Amino acid sequence: MSQKRLVLATKNQGKVREFRSLLAGAGFEIVGLDPDAPEVSETGDTFEENALIKARAASALTGLPALAEDSGIVVDALGGEPGVHSARWVPGSDEDRVRALLARMAEVPAERRTARYVSVIAVVLPSGREELFRGELEGRLAEAPRGTGGFGYDPIFVVADGRTVAEMALEEKNGISHRSRALARCLERLPALLEEG
């Protein structure tokens, strides 16, 4: 059986490699966007809207079925912030964003420090058919960063066993992450979706 070609709506080759690894053995050839492809503005108010914006643009540009992901951290005590703005909420590095979030949460008691990582994967076919797949990881925010693994908010995102995501091995993180949960749901439907066109 030949592999089905999918375009991942990103120019980031690291993300392309990650998705190739996550989809290894599933029968898909994953390609990224050309570095010269036009930038797409993520103007949506939800993870779903932003994932669809990116997937629609990638499918229209390439004529291929497209996969796009949007993700972030949702903090209950902050009314859902930073949400869709997680990667650009505060200018600077991941560490700058972690410091800013901890500063905003400084007076929030432990029982109100609940948060979740959210990942939404959009699949858009050249026919115009669209489907969304959502994965979440519940947790709470630590009072200080711990661990050296991961990226983004991982050093302050505490899972059920009391460790931060940054204290976990990559394989462990991938086994429970919001992204792996969304991707698992996507993989359940993707072969049939591609057949249906």
UniProtKB/Swiss-Prot annotation:
Its cofactor is Mg(2+). GO terms for molecular function: dITP diphosphatase activity; ITP diphosphatase activity; metal ion binding; nucleotide binding; ribonucleoside triphosphate phosphatase activity; XTP diphosphatase activity. Keywords: Hydrolase, Magnesium, Metal-binding, Nucleotide metabolism, Nucleotide-binding. CDD domains: HAM1. Its EC number is 3.6.1.66. The active site is at residue 70. InterPro entries: dITP/XTP_pyrophosphatase (IPR020922), ITPase-like_fam (IPR029001), RdgB/HAM1 (IPR002637). It holds the Pfam family Ham1p_like. Mg(2+) binds at residue 70. Coiled coil: none annotated. Binds 1 Mg(2+) ion per subunit. It comes from the Bacteria. GO terms for cellular component: cytosol. It catalyses: XTP + H2O = XMP + diphosphate + H(+); dITP + H2O = dIMP + diphosphate + H(+); ITP + H2O = IMP + diphosphate + H(+). GO terms for biological process: nucleotide metabolic process; purine nucleoside triphosphate catabolic process. Substrate binds at residues 10-15, 71, 151-154, 173, 178-179. Belongs to the HAM1 NTPase family. Homodimer. PANTHER family: INOSINE TRIPHOSPHATE PYROPHOSPHATASE, INOSINE TRIPHOSPHATE PYROPHOSPHATASE/HAM1 PROTEIN. Pyrophosphatase that catalyzes the hydrolysis of nucleoside triphosphates to their monophosphate derivatives, with a high preference for the non-canonical purine nucleotides XTP (xanthosine triphosphate), dITP (deoxyinosine triphosphate) and ITP. Seems to function as a house-cleaning enzyme that removes non-canonical purine nucleotides from the nucleotide pool, thus preventing their incorporation into DNA/RNA and avoiding chromosomal lesions. This is dITP/XTP pyrophosphatase.
